[in-house]
Amino acid sequence: MKRLLLLAAASATALGVTAAKAEPLKIGIIESLSGAQTSTGRLYANAVEYGVNQINKAGGFNGEPVQVTEYDNAGGAPEAADKFRQAVADGVDIIFQGASSAIAGQLTEDVRKHNIRNPDSKVLFINLGGEAMELTGEKCQFYHFRFTTTAPMRVNALVNAMKAAGDLGTKVYSINQNYSWGQDMQKAVEDAADKGGYKIVGQVLHDVNKIQDFAPFVARIKAANPDTVFTGNWSNDLLLLMKATGDAGLDVTFATAFLDQPGNIANAGKTALGDYIANNYDNSATDGKFAEAYKSATGHYPVFVEGNSALALAQLQQALKTLDFRGGKIDVTKIALALEDSTYDSPVGPISVRKADHQTIRPVVVSKVVKNPKYPADGTDMGFQTVKIVPGDQAIYPVQSSCHMKRPKE
């Protein structure tokens, strides 16, 4: 089911009589809006809609309000491919997606092939959450932009911050989902072992969104007796892992990528205190202005993936301001080139785009679960407190040798 949103329609009046003649910029959200990943997919969609609303409040683009259509991929790559074809038929110019690297991998290939076959109606893919290394490696392509971190960026930030704080220990366990992202996380933990001064005492890759009870996995973790458990799990696989951890009263520090997903702190209970997360954004790392603006518009502070996703739209808005199609045809290639040249001063630091692979060079925020924070989570007295912000130029890694991007003729 799709939902067409003409956000901030009142802005159309301000655009005057030319609005009816102009070509609107069309955005498609191809997201997990049903199934096991809905809790994540809906937050991505919410953030995109918020960001588009901000663009429209400022006057829209190309003489029209920006249009947004939601497409439900139901958490699957084949469904995402079907929805991409539907989006193309609807004339979508830019697609957004975040929940699952597997789906992002499907979409970036769909976009690449479509653009080769249809040079006069290209589509741009802005990836909000697919963090698999291959997306800016062997699958890198000009019309894909990644507005999030990757496993090495998160793991290295965690290792450095936790070691400096004396919270890392010398024994580490790794539990991750068995697909591209989880495999990248496991490798990043292995690669950081020497620098972190720890030994890996156990690691496991498990099926994605199929485990209903993580108690056996928690028992294995307990038996290995680690100081820290690294996990890139997200959605139900993290919610259920945290529940099993809380139920078992497991006394171990978790180093995570997505602990701020709603429900995780409540599920883990007091065992969450002292756990870490490396993320794109944390309300506590900012002056609060963006968080308050988001709350004013949506009724809640940005949580989980909403912050960095909304900021990606703000960076797109900044890039669009440099373009003027005079109400005529939308040129996606020019939008991509404008994005390449953009640097956005986000609430946690500057975000730019590396032209060689379209990985954003962005700050990584390391936070720790504490009692009585400024922004409590899940209706508890616990939440996140920023420990360190790693600047983008320190967090980024070299372009992968497997990336051979073909650029358009300029």
Give a label for each model feature.
Residues S39-L43, F61-G137, F147, H206-F214:
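Beta-alpha junction/loop-to-helix N-cap segments that form part of ligand/metal-binding clefts
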Residues Q141, M242-L313, K321-F325, D381-K409:
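Extracellular/periplasmic periplasmic-binding protein-like sensory domains
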Residues N46-V68, D194-K199:
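Signal peptide-proximal N-terminal region
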Residues M1-K21:
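Gram-negative bacterial Sec-dependent N-terminal signal peptides
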Residues G28-E49, Y71-P78, A99-S100, I175-D184, ...:
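Extracytoplasmic "Venus flytrap"
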Residues A87-S101, N118-L128, K171-N176, N225-S235, ...:
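Periplasmic-binding protein-like
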